[in-house]
């Protein structure tokens, strides 16, 4: 049975117990939210996930870290290190988005080593296979769409981004739009190119029931990808974006009817004043479905510091109801990220998630904030470091410029906490 099937039958899985303990909530709340489709617990039947996560209404905001190879940079060892570092610094899940090398070996290696859920975008494999055969990247068959989904499922992938909302009607609207950047989703562009070349409807949309059957067999959580998401803040919140959203909203109901877990992916470039509207509209159209946002970035001028822009947008999005944040690294829009970029990206998005949790009144988040306050009051540096999202950096800076007494070298003998303690 799938996690949703079990939840609807009143059965509590081991994974449900684990996430309930982590969240500090009653397991019945976990079971009920999964049964209603307001939360998902990504867990392929073939993947041993020792650190499962629950994504959705009423639970802590989660962070995903993308890793994966590209042409000229296809070291499995580097990707393993990226995965290790991402998990060490708090990533709740990984997505393997490789486009070069032995894609299946890389994917299987990461799934095997990962204690957290692993996601992917199967359509990439179809395009890469065609390119490596010296063909056009969209020169593959309709059968390849589903063969790749099955291959990823067999490899233990827990959740998949499927750009099912890229329909002929949506595509026609985009072609005739005034968008500066027509399509920036790689998966969306591949499918759109295939549709135009073959003058056909999107197979994922046309044969959605077949996709659901595969997902149910392996208990894959479907993340309905927004292939028409805006690629610039000046293109945000246009009719093309919302046309696709409404298509995906209809498909959410069909997935729930088949007892397949489903999420909605949202835009990655959104002005700050439009974040609330976008998140709330997605929640409404998706009838409370978990929301997975790529960022979002509230400015496109932060190249080299996109992880900071991402944290700003992500914190606000999380506060307004986004459940799952995909990190952005300092290398976004510039190059393939290295291990250090992955670390910086995870920390930035974890900060955004924690900020949102505190603002939403998450009990566990508030307990941790209280522990930090008490540690600062007591000059308990080790506890402060342990509670910090950037523990290594915090400890390194403290040790580089030490102070021999209580407090730190910022204030020295003029420490406000120490003075207040002495004269109170």
UniProtKB/Swiss-Prot annotation:
Q: Which GO terms describe its cellular component?
A: cytosol
Q: Name one GO biological process term.
A: thiamine biosynthetic process
Instruction: Tell me the route in metabolism or biology where this protein functions.
Output: Cofactor biosynthesis; thiamine diphosphate biosynthesis
Keywords in alphabetical order: 4Fe-4S, Iron, Iron-sulfur, Lyase, Metal-binding, S-adenosyl-L-methionine, Thiamine biosynthesis, Zinc
Chemical reaction(s) catalysed: 5-amino-1-(5-phospho-beta-D-ribosyl)imidazole + S-adenosyl-L-methionine = 4-amino-2-methyl-5-(phosphooxymethyl)pyrimidine + CO + 5'-deoxyadenosine + formate + L-methionine + 3 H(+)
Q: Which residues cross the membrane?
A: none
Q: Which cofactor does it need?
A: [4Fe-4S] cluster
Judging by the UniProt lineage, the source's domain of life is: Bacteria
Q: Provide the binding site for substrate.
A: 66, 95, 124, 163, 185-187, 226-229, 265, 292
Q: What is its EC number?
A: 4.1.99.17
Q: Which GO terms describe its molecular function?
A: 4 iron, 4 sulfur cluster binding; carbon-carbon lyase activity; zinc ion binding
Here the disulfide bonds are none
- Indicate the secretion signal residues: none
Entry binding sites for [4Fe-4S] cluster: 408, 411, 415
Where on this chain does Zn(2+) bind?
269, 333
Query: Does the keyword field hold Transmembrane helix?
Result: no
Q: Does the keyword Metal-binding apply?
A: yes
Q: How is the cofactor bound?
A: Binds 1 [4Fe-4S] cluster per subunit. The cluster is coordinated with 3 cysteines and an exchangeable S-adenosyl-L-methionine.
Q: Write out the function statement from the record.
A: Catalyzes the synthesis of the hydroxymethylpyrimidine phosphate (HMP-P) moiety of thiamine from aminoimidazole ribotide (AIR) in a radical S-adenosyl-L-methionine (SAM)-dependent reaction.
Say which family it is in. Answer: Belongs to the ThiC family.
Q: Which NCBIfam families match?
A: PRK13352.1, thiC
Could you identify this protein by its name?
Phosphomethylpyrimidine synthase
Q: Tell me what organism the protein belongs to.
A: Thermotoga neapolitana (strain ATCC 49049 / DSM 4359 / NBRC 107923 / NS-E)
- Underlying gene: thiC
């Amino acid at each position: 049975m799938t996690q949703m099937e079990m939840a609807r039958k009143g059965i509590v899985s081991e994974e449900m117990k684990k996430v309930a303990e982590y969240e500090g909530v009653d397991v019945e709340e976990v079971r009920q939210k999964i049964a209603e489709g307001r939360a998902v617990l990504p867990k392929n039947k073939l993947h041993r996930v020792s650190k499962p996560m629950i994504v959705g209404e009423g639970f802590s905001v989660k962070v995903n870290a993308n890793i994966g190879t590209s042409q000229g940079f296809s070291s499995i060892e580097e990707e393993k290190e990226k995965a290790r570092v991402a998990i060490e610094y708090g990533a709740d899940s990984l997505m393997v988005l490789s486009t070069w090398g032995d894609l299946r070996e890389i994917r299987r290696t990461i799934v095997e080593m990962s204690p957290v859920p692993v996601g992917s975008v199967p359509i990439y494999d179809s395009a890469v296979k065609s390119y490596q055969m010296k063909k056009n990247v969209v020169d593959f068959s309709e059968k390849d769409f589903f063969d790749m989904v099955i291959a990823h499922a067999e490899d233990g992938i827990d959740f998949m981004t499927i750009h099912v909302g890229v329909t002929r009607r949506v595509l026609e609207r985009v072609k005739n739009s005034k968008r500066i950047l027509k399509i920036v989703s790689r998966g969306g562009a591949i499918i759109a190119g295939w549709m135009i070349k073959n003058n056909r409807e999107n197979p994922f949309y046309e044969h959605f029931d077949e996709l659901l059957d595969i997902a149910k067999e392996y208990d894959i959580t479907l993340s309905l990808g927004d292939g028409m998401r805006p690629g610039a803040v000046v293109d945000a919140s246009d009719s093309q974006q919302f046309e696709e959203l409404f298509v995906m909203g209809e498909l959410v109901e069909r997935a729930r009817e088949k007892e397949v877990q489903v999420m909605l992916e949202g835009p990655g470039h959104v002005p700050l004043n439009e974040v609330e509207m976008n998140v709330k509209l997605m929640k409404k159209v998706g009838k409370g479905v978990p929301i997975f946002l790529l960022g979002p970035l509230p400015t496109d001028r932060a190249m080299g510091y996109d992880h900071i822009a991402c944290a700003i947008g992500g914190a606000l999005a999380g506060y307004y109801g986004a459940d799952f944040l995909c990190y952005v690294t300092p290398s976004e829009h510039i190059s393939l990220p290295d291990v250090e970029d992955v670390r910086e990206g995870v920390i930035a998005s974890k900060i955004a998630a924690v900020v949102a949790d505190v603002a939403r009144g998450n009990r566990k988040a508030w307990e941790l904030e209280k522990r930090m306050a008490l540690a600062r009051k007591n000059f308990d540096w080790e506890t402060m470091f342990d509670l910090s999202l950037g523990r290594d950096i915090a400890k390194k800076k403290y040790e580089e410029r030490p102070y021999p007494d209580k407090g730190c070298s910022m204030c020295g003998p003029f420490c406000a906490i120490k003075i207040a303690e002495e004269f109170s």
